[in-house]
Each structure stands twice: as C-alpha cells, then as structure tokens.
C-alpha cells in the first residue's frame, strides 16, 4: 500500500502542538539518532520560517523549513531537509523540494534560494537548479557545500 500524502505549509505560529511535536521528533530521529549529529536543533530560526511537511496518518514523513531572508543568509534559504525512514525511496524529497521552490517563487516572489546541503546530495540539488558556490566545509562533522539557485527548476 502506498503512502497517504498530505502536504502542509505553515508558519511557526500556525503549527499545532501535535504538528510541532512530530516535526521535532522526526528531526531528532533523522539528524541526531541516524546521523549521530549532536547539535542544538532548537535554534530560534523556526520562529522565522515556513514549515513544509508531509504527513501520513499523523506521522511526519518529509520535512523542511523555509527561512526568511536575513535569518541565515541574505537570501531566503531552505534547511533541515529530511525524509523519515518510512518516507524514503518514494520521491517525497524531490516533490517536497519542488513544492518549496514553487512556494518561494510564486508566493514569496523571491528568485534566489540558498541552501547548505550535505555533500552527498549535491547532484540531487543540482538537478533542481542549484549551483555550488562554496568549497566543501564541515558542519557538525558532516561535509557540506553552500548552493544557490537563481532560476530553480521545479515540477509538481
């Protein structure tokens, strides 16, 4: 049986307590437990972001946040991109990124998006129109590159 796809995008203050709990739970599951990356997840940036996520029976299976201009970079940025173990290999990551790009271009009327992407996902982000704009650097002991999209490709 396939995944029941229910996409939502909300500002921090619009999230229900249950939605916020599920988002924080899956972020800890993926970034802290799976990637053994001990870091301060609650960084105040969530309050200045749109939260795009996919739910399946109340469980968050894919998530990212779209940060306002000036929060992390001069441009709008996308971060905390993840799919849960149960959501992987179903195309949710690509669909989610396409939805995020479309939202930024059409609703926020911004043309540039910056990300700090894990190096192993560089080809994936390039396929969406992002270009590498930095050398490789370590963020929480994981190789990353900064990438910028000035005319992202997106398909829903």
Enumerate the language-model features and the residues they cover.
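Short amphipathic alpha-helix that is part of the acyltransferase structural core
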Residues: 2-51, 55-60, 156
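Conserved GNAT acetyl-CoA-binding A-motif
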Residues: 97, 104-117
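A short beta-turn/loop motif at secondary-structure boundaries
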Residues: 42-47, 70, 138-139
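Residue-level recognition of the GNAT/N-acetyltransferase active site
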Residues: 84-85, 116-118
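Conserved acetyl-CoA-binding loop-helix of GNAT-fold acetyltransferases
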Residues: 83, 89-102
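A conserved beta-turn-beta hairpin within the catalytic core of GNAT-like acetyltransferases
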Residues: 69-78, 88, 107-111, 141-143
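Conserved beta-strand in the GNAT
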Residues: 53, 59-69, 75-82
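Conserved catalytic-core motifs of GNAT/GCN5-like acyltransferases
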Residues: 114, 126, 131-146
């Amino acid at each position: 049986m396939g995944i029941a796809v229910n996409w939502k995008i909300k500002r921090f203050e619009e999230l229900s307590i249950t939605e916020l709990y599920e988002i924080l739970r899956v972020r800890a599951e993926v970034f802290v437990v799976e990637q053994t990356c001990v870091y301060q997840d609650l960084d105040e940036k969530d309050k200045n972001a749109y939260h795009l996520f996919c739910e399946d029976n109340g469980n968050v299976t894919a998530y990212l946040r779209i940060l306002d201009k000036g929060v992390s970079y001069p441009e709008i940025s996308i971060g905390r991109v993840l799919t849960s173990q149960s959501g992987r290999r179903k195309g949710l990551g690509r669909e989610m990124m396409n939805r995020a790009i479309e939202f930024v271009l059409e609703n926020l009327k911004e043309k540039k998006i910056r990300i700090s992407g894990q190096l192993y996902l560089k080809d994936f982000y390039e396929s969406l129109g992002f270009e590498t704009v930095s050398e490789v650097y370590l963020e929480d002991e994981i190789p990353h590159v900064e990438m910028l999209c000035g005319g992202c490709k997106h398909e829903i």
